[in-house]
């Protein structure tokens, strides 16, 4: 992890530390309904306050067009108080006199949340005058919001160019896990890429075939590959117009020495609904009026066999329509298998993306994986091999 400056490198005593955090939490009737993201930033806040710094938290919330009280961070600051077990101040703006006087009242070791950065158009435009206004409020900048690191905004990228910049604890652990899984992995590396559409994961597949040893293609996107190989997929979700693209990806994989694993059997039904009448068939036997809704047990067995030789797993996307029983079976079986091997110490496992996290929670194994990233877009862009502006700004 020497590539990034961390809080261990910083002198924080009596410094105003601007911390970019992810406070985009679910809310109902002005109350936070899931505090997972608040818990994730506690180690960074505590490191700063323990070292005598003043923690000044910056974040966006929702997509307001200008000032909108329904998108205020005030209720989030209140919820954070409960998590921290201490008072958290709140300023009703993130720049200007209101913010600077509130920060000037802070004693060493105290915490304040500034109002939603997106109340100002300069945030998403990364406008120089807005960056300057934010920078004037702090001595040091810390980014602890990996989930927003793919955005070159004022509070994620602009500030890091203005002030001495460091990675927070959550950012640090995310970068360590991803570097371990893809940049300098213990091989063989097996990747699972699922989900409904090839079109949304073209760059991802193109990058992974060059980086991993085995690529398991699952979910609706596997149907596009099966169709490209001449299989009949009936009424299944399938991007027939991407057949040439699918074949190109298979050729790229072959040239790179990456083994592709596609489903060998499938759970099919005539209706897309929970508990619909279904049967397990070989991928050569899908009826014209049937749709593939999950991978079958033979496919699960093939993946298990490939896992026997793997040392690292990177997972993004489910095997089937996991939100509906019984079409969650393959996702649950493989997730539990990976979780069990990770617990036994034979596998390093990293997973990420919204559907993936939901699927692992559904299988009850999110806690068994080495690392589960809640950063949807940023996690995908990292897997695609793209430089993330918010991360690049933290390099030594």
From Swiss-Prot:
<feature type="binding site">
    <location>
        <begin position="353"/>
        <end position="356"/>
    </location>
    <ligand>
        <name>ATP</name>
    </ligand>
</feature>
<dbReference type="GO" id="GO:0005829">
    <property type="term" value="C:cytosol"/>
</dbReference>
<comment type="similarity">
    <text>Belongs to the phosphoglycerate kinase family.</text>
</comment>
<feature type="binding site">
    <location>
        <position position="323"/>
    </location>
    <ligand>
        <name>ATP</name>
    </ligand>
</feature>
<comment type="pathway">
    <text>Carbohydrate degradation; glycolysis; pyruvate from D-glyceraldehyde 3-phosphate: step 2/5.</text>
</comment>
<protein>
    <recommendedName>
        <fullName>Phosphoglycerate kinase</fullName>
        <ecNumber>2.7.2.3</ecNumber>
    </recommendedName>
</protein>
<keyword id="KW-0547">Nucleotide-binding</keyword>
<dbReference type="GO" id="GO:0043531">
    <property type="term" value="F:ADP binding"/>
</dbReference>
<dbReference type="InterPro" id="IPR015911">
    <property type="entry name" value="Phosphoglycerate_kinase_CS"/>
</dbReference>
<feature type="binding site">
    <location>
        <position position="37"/>
    </location>
    <ligand>
        <name>substrate</name>
    </ligand>
</feature>
<keyword id="KW-0963">Cytoplasm</keyword>
<keyword id="KW-0418">Kinase</keyword>
<keyword id="KW-0808">Transferase</keyword>
<feature type="binding site">
    <location>
        <position position="201"/>
    </location>
    <ligand>
        <name>ATP</name>
    </ligand>
</feature>
<dbReference type="Pfam" id="PF00162">
    <property type="entry name" value="PGK"/>
</dbReference>
<dbReference type="GO" id="GO:0006096">
    <property type="term" value="P:glycolytic process"/>
</dbReference>
<dbReference type="InterPro" id="IPR036043">
    <property type="entry name" value="Phosphoglycerate_kinase_sf"/>
</dbReference>
<dbReference type="InterPro" id="IPR015824">
    <property type="entry name" value="Phosphoglycerate_kinase_N"/>
</dbReference>
<keyword id="KW-0067">ATP-binding</keyword>
<feature type="binding site">
    <location>
        <position position="118"/>
    </location>
    <ligand>
        <name>substrate</name>
    </ligand>
</feature>
<dbReference type="GO" id="GO:0004618">
    <property type="term" value="F:phosphoglycerate kinase activity"/>
</dbReference>
<feature type="binding site">
    <location>
        <begin position="22"/>
        <end position="24"/>
    </location>
    <ligand>
        <name>substrate</name>
    </ligand>
</feature>
<comment type="subunit">
    <text>Monomer.</text>
</comment>
<feature type="binding site">
    <location>
        <begin position="60"/>
        <end position="63"/>
    </location>
    <ligand>
        <name>substrate</name>
    </ligand>
</feature>
<keyword id="KW-0324">Glycolysis</keyword>
<dbReference type="InterPro" id="IPR001576">
    <property type="entry name" value="Phosphoglycerate_kinase"/>
</dbReference>
<feature type="binding site">
    <location>
        <position position="151"/>
    </location>
    <ligand>
        <name>substrate</name>
    </ligand>
</feature>
<dbReference type="GO" id="GO:0005524">
    <property type="term" value="F:ATP binding"/>
</dbReference>
<dbReference type="GO" id="GO:0006094">
    <property type="term" value="P:gluconeogenesis"/>
</dbReference>
């Amino acid at each position: 992890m020497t590539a990034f400056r961390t809080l261990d490198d910083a002198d924080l005593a009596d410094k105003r530390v601007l911390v970019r955090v992810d406070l985009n939490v679910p809310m109902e009737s002005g109350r936070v309904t899931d505090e997972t993201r608040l818990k994730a930033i506690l180690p960074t806040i505590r490191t700063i306050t323990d070292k005598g710094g003043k923690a000044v938290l910056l974040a966006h919330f929702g997509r307001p067009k200008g000032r909108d009280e329904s998108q205020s961070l005030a209720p989030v600051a209140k919820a954070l108080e409960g998590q921290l077990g201490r008072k958290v101040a709140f300023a009703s703006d993130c720049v200007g006199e209101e913010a600077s006087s509130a920060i000037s009242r802070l004693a060493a070791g105290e915490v304040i949340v500034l109002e939603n950065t997106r109340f100002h158009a300069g945030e998403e435009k990364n406008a120089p005058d807005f960056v300057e206004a934010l920078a004037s409020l702090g001595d040091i900048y810390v980014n602890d919001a990996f989930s927003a690191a793919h955005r070159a905004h004022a509070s994620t990228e602009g500030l890091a160019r203005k002030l001495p910049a460091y990675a927070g604890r959550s950012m640090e652990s995310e970068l360590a896990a991803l570097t371990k899984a893809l940049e300098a992995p213990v091989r063989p590396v097996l990747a699972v890429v699922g989900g409904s559409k090839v079109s949304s994961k073209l760059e991802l597949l193109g990058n992974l075939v060059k980086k991993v040893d085995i690529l398991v293609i699952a979910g609706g996107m596997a149907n596009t590959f099966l169709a490209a190989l001449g299989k009949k997929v009936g009424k299944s979700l399938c991007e027939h117009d991407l057949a040439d693209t699918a074949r190109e990806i298979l050729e790229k994989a072959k040239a790179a020495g990456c083994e592709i694993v596609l489903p060998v059997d499938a759970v099919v039904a005539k209706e897309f609904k929970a508990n619909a009448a279904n049967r397990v068939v070989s991928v050569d036997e899908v009826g014209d009026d049937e749709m593939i809704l999950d991978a079958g047990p033979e496919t699960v067995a093939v993946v298990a066999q490939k896992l026997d030789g793997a040392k690292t797993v990177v997972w993004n996307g489910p095997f089937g329509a996991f939100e509906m029983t019984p079409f969650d079976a393959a996702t649950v079986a493989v997730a539990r298998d990976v979780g069990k091997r990770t617990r036994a110490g034979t596998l390093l496992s990293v997973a990420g993306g919204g559907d993936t996290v939901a699927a692992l929670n559904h299988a009850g194994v999110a806690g068994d994986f080495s690392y589960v990233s809640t950063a949807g877009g940023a996690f995908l862009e990292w897997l695609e091999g793209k430089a993330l502006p918010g991360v690049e700004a933290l390099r030594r």
